[in-house]
Amino acid sequence: MVAFGKYLQRKQIEEWSGYYINYKLMKKKVKQYAEQIQGGSQHPRHVLKDFSRMLDTQIETTVLFMLEQQGLLSGRLAKLRESHDAILEQPDISRIFELREAYRDVGRDLLQLLKFVELNAIGLRKILKKFDKRFGYRFADYYVKTRANHPYSQLQQVFKHVGVGAVVGAISRNLHELQENEGSFYSIYDQPVLPAQDPVVEAINNAVDKLTFSTNFLNFLAQHALIMQDDLVTPSEDTIDERSYHFNSLLLNLGNTFLYMVNTYIIVPTADDYSMSLGAAATVCGVVIGSMAVAQVFSSVYFSAWSNKSYFKPLVFSSIALFIGNLMYALAYDANSIALLLLGRVCCGLGSARAVNRRYISDCVPLRIRMQASAGFVSASALGMACGPALAGLLQIKFKFYKFTFNQSTLPGWVMAVAWLFYLVWLCISFREPLRDTEDGEKNNRNETTSDRVESSRVEEGLRLPLLITSGIKPEDEEECDESEESPEDSHKPANSFIEAYRLLTPSVKVQLLIYFMLKYSMEILLSESSVITSYYFSWTTSSVAIFLACLGLTVLPINILVGSYISNMFEDRQILLTSEIIVFLGILFSFNLFVPYTVPQYVISGLIMFVAAEVLEGVNLSLLSRVMSSRLSKGTYNGGLLSTEAGTLARVVADATITLGGYLGRGHLLNATLLPSLVICIGSIVATCCTYNSLY
């Protein structure tokens, strides 16, 4: 908060200074309102109306100026079009160069306008959050309800922007035409290879994507990864040196993600048979599957902490732990030991390096391609989820070699052990440890000149100075600071413990984590008990279960394409969120076996509805979570990705425990006994969503 006032002054265009939101005034007003309410001199309702009116005026000033500038840019483009048509009739190479540069000048001015809108959008978000911190969502409920959803809302004009696409399209198309015309005057040896897209147009598109939180398929996938970044970071200010970025290392992290998801789901179709072959009940499959998740609850924390110092060593440890765990899982059959089986799965869970994979993308991949890397992380997870059961369906062979048995129960362990061994070799050969921040700093210090050091120290000193002067006379234009605000260092300081991270969770964040828990719980119930339920009601074989689970996994990417490319462009995220929750509720409700004999169509259709809706819900849920979560949770050990991972892993643990406990009621009652908690949690999440609906923006 404190840092943003100076950031706004530093980044704003001087000629446009009168059209930026008056962040300092609104911040002072918030403090003044708090004092008035505490003193009893002002009613909260009057405060809401007064501040809403002031914010409306600020937004109106910004929007009208934005539209005015767009009109000026459009007028310049219209005049350039006349010159363009004249050049097409009488080609002149010098005039083509001039016209291209004129179009680029318009593009640069449009880029400045987009940065203007972006600064105002960030300021609005921050002042809304500040008001929420002071008054507990009363203002957000009121303002968002009465402004954001209005058909003539100027608030949406700021966040969504209007008419920019037409200007960008005109600049891009005309530059492309001029490039083609220019090429006709040169031989192939004189004309250098032109880029696929003009750098100015590419910069504009990047600014548009950043401003609008573009909801295309790639970004929608990236939101699943919950790899957060600061609002104030731009590609030009990205601190990650692209020369130190290593593609093979990123590929190895994505490979780790893929193999771990395969490892998680490859045993699901055969876990009940394996349990019975060792003398346990079929429903013990819940413990077998869930033991990996139990270990992951703890491994996520130490892997996240370990990634503060190294990325290579945690990945090596992960590979070794998973290799040993899968060997133990495979050998449990010949040892006739359920304990060895469970210990093997626990060992696999201790090798869960998803926190490292997320952290590597967040900290070591340049901002320019971070969205693609995040989408790759989600795609690798989805592909692994589909490949696991499919691979289990292919391993329907049985033979014995020396003293070791190879069958449908043990082969998943043997195959994954070999896979992790090959991965470990590849890791040792190809992975390159990135430079840490301290190493980068030392390297930069050796290279920068004395004047650079002086200038850098001045900038850093200016950023560290408090905005409230504590001695002497305070200038009138100096920003005011109050006790509720964090210092610049604290506002970017990561949380150092789960308790500190929990204190940063607002009601909206807690509700989103509850929703994430609910959807992971429901999906785990559906997947983990599928082999037990289908064998009891329909006498399905392992191959049939594997095909069913693989088909469910294969729906992930198509559904994300549909939602990310189309549905999310037509509806708000919170509308999709609530609708998806209701559909999950209906899917759970239709899955119950109550009055009529249970049939395959009922099970498959209800399961498909529940799974697909949960996948849609996950993407939207994590998208909203990344927006409402504190920026202090974007980095460090106890980050937003770790919190969501822990919530999802805990849900899987509870779900698998529910399956095992439900088994004591008998296989005939297992279905309803496990669906009932899912139904209750789903209803609770819907109610919680309705209570915080107006704060989800």
UniProtKB/Swiss-Prot annotation:
The keyword Membrane applies. GO terms for cellular component: membrane. Residues 2-145 form the SPX domain. The keyword Transmembrane applies. Its main location: membrane. It comes from the Eukaryota. This is SPX domain-containing membrane protein At1g63010. It is found in: Membrane.
